[in-house]
From Swiss-Prot:
Belongs to the non-disulfide-bridged peptide (NDBP) superfamily. Short antimicrobial peptide (group 4) family. The modification Lysine amide is found at residue 41. The keyword Secreted applies. Shows a low ability to inhibit hepatitis C virus (HCV) infection in Huh7.5.1 cells, and no ability to inhibit hepatitis B virus in HepG2.2.15 cells. Keywords: Amidation, Antimicrobial, Antiviral protein, Secreted, Signal. The keyword Signal applies. The lineage of its organism: Eukaryota, Metazoa, Ecdysozoa, Arthropoda, Chelicerata. Residues 47-75 form a propeptide. GO terms for cellular component: extracellular region. Its main location: secreted. GO terms for biological process: regulation of defense response to virus. Expressed by the venom gland. This is Peptide Ctri10036. It comes from Chaerilus tricostatus.
Length: 75
């Protein structure tokens, strides 16, 4: 009697493990693509941030130059 339950348990266990492996094999590629897209977005934000900082520095230098030129109106 116990051997019959053990056999049923093993069959159900194999089916469950097979289903889990199928689920994981379908889940892993989508998880990898999601992580890579997040990494790319992070890089893009960092690049845009550095471009924005450069633009702010350029505007500040431009304003400093205008301020300097306003002190010497002849030039």
């Amino acid at each position: 009697m116990n051997s019959k339950y053990l056999f049923v348990f093993l069959i159900l266990n194999v089916i469950f493990i097979d289903l889990c492996q199928g689920f994981l094999w379908s889940l892993i590629p989508s998880a990898i693509s999601a992580v890579t897209s997040l990494i790319k977005k992070g890089r893009r934000r960092r690049e845009l941030g550095s471009q924005y900082d450069y633009l702010q520095d350029f505007r500040k230098r431009e304003l400093d130059l205008d301020d300097l030129l306003s002190k010497f109106p002849d030039y």
